[in-house]
Curated annotation (Swiss-Prot):
Main localization of the protein described in the UniProt heading: membrane
Organism listed in the record: Mus musculus (Mouse)
Protein name: Olfactory receptor 10N1
Residues with glycosylation annotation: N3
Annotated GO biological process: G protein-coupled receptor signaling pathway; sensory perception of smell
SUPFAM superfamilies for the chain: Family A G protein-coupled receptor-like
Molecular function GO terms recorded: G protein-coupled receptor activity; olfactory receptor activity
Stretches in topological domain Extracellular: 1-23, 77-95, 158-202, 259-264
One GO CC term on file: plasma membrane
CDD domains according to UniProt: 7tmA_OR10D-like
Transmembrane segments: 24-44, 56-76, 96-116, 137-157, 203-223, 238-258, 265-285
Function description: Odorant receptor.
Family: Belongs to the G-protein coupled receptor 1 family.
Length: 310
């Protein structure tokens, strides 16, 4: 039996090729993270406080705002900590937790995008039966299924990764614990974990993207059948914000998978776009492109101003 010296912590080396830029990166990421939390918390508050937004569409949008606060919180606080105090160590259990929650929240949010696309399909293609089809019980069931898919996906990846033995080098050449960065440090054979991880991530991403495309093909056909320009504009406007958010979420992932040869710097930039920038953009997209959300946000600000003047 091999005598391994097991690791109890990992060292995160950070974003590749950014040595000497720690202070600048800290300021930039702190700014983005702050506005991500602020923007999404305002949208969530606006949806909760306005009775006119208590519909299936805004129920899912409220959940998306919660995910857009939680998802970057898996990686950003730790990254800000080591950028500010230059302490890149993360415990073995902390690394496992980071990988698990990153994939749990990321895949569940991907499922939520598919659910939201289906919701828009029902609203535009079956408007008279919309509230009958998207009953509260159905909405909750769809969210539970999304959580279960995300939990299964994250459990498979985390268990396969951390059942391996890690010894010798503990330097993770990345800014957080993810499969491609952690698996090369394994002292035992990691081929199965790599293969299952690639298939699992690739299959789930393709299935979710396919489901979104199917919903929007039906939506596109339904919009083209609407005779009035005003009707087409109204139908399209209800989907434009969601479609823009999907492009922001899937765009970086598609870019990274189309690479012929992996580029560590490009991979890190894409992950930052997906994990940190995209959640901030979602709050901007929905607050700028959705009239109902803008109206409700205005009321929230008016209430804050009114109470502040008392």
């Amino acid at each position: 039996m091999d005598n391994y010296t097991l690791l109890n912590e990992f060292i995160l080396l950070g974003i590749p090729q950014t040595q000497g830029l720690e202070t600048l990166l800290f300021v930039v990421f702190l700014f983005i993270y702050f506005f991500t939390l602020l923007g999404n918390s305002l949208i969530f508050t606006a949806i909760i406080s306005s009775s006119t937004l208590h519909t299936p569409m805004y129920f899912f949008l409220g959940l998306l705002s919660v995910f857009d606060m939680l998802f970057p919180s898996v990686t950003c606080p730790k990254m800000l900590f080591y950028l500010s105090v230059r302490s890149p160590a993360i415990s073995y259990k902390g690394c496992a937790a980071q990988l698990f929650f990153y994939h749990l929240l990321g895949s569940t949010e991907g499922c939520l995008y598919s659910v939201m696309a289906y919701d828009r399909y029902v609203a535009i293609c079956h408007p008279l039966r919309y509230m009958l089809i998207m009953k509260p019980g159905v909405c909750v069931s769809l969210v539970i299924i999304a959580w279960l898919v995300g939990c299964l996906h994250a459990t498979i990846l985390t268990s396969l990764t951390f059942q391996l033995v890690y010894c010798a080098s503990n330097q993770v050449d990345y800014f957080f614990c993810d499969l491609p960065a952690v698996l090369p440090l394994a002292c035992t054979d990691s081929k199965l974990a790599r293969k299952v991880g690639s298939i699992n991530v690739g299959f789930l991403a393709l299935m979710l993207l396919f489901s979104v495309c199917v919903s929007y093909v039906h939506i596109g056909v339904a919009i083209l059948r609407i005779r009035s320009a005003e009707g087409r504009q109204k139908a399209f406007s209800t989907c434009s914000a969601h479609l823009t958010a999907i492009l922001c979420a899937y765009g970086p992932v598609i870019i990274i998978y189309l690479q012929r040869t992996p580029n560590p710097l490009l991979g890190a930039v894409v992950q930052i776009l997906n994990n940190i920038v995209s959640p901030m953009l979602n709050s901007l997209i929905y607050s700028l492109r959705n009239k109902e959300v803008k109206r409700s946000l205005r009321r929230v600000f008016q209430n804050i101003t009114f109470h502040g003047q008392k």
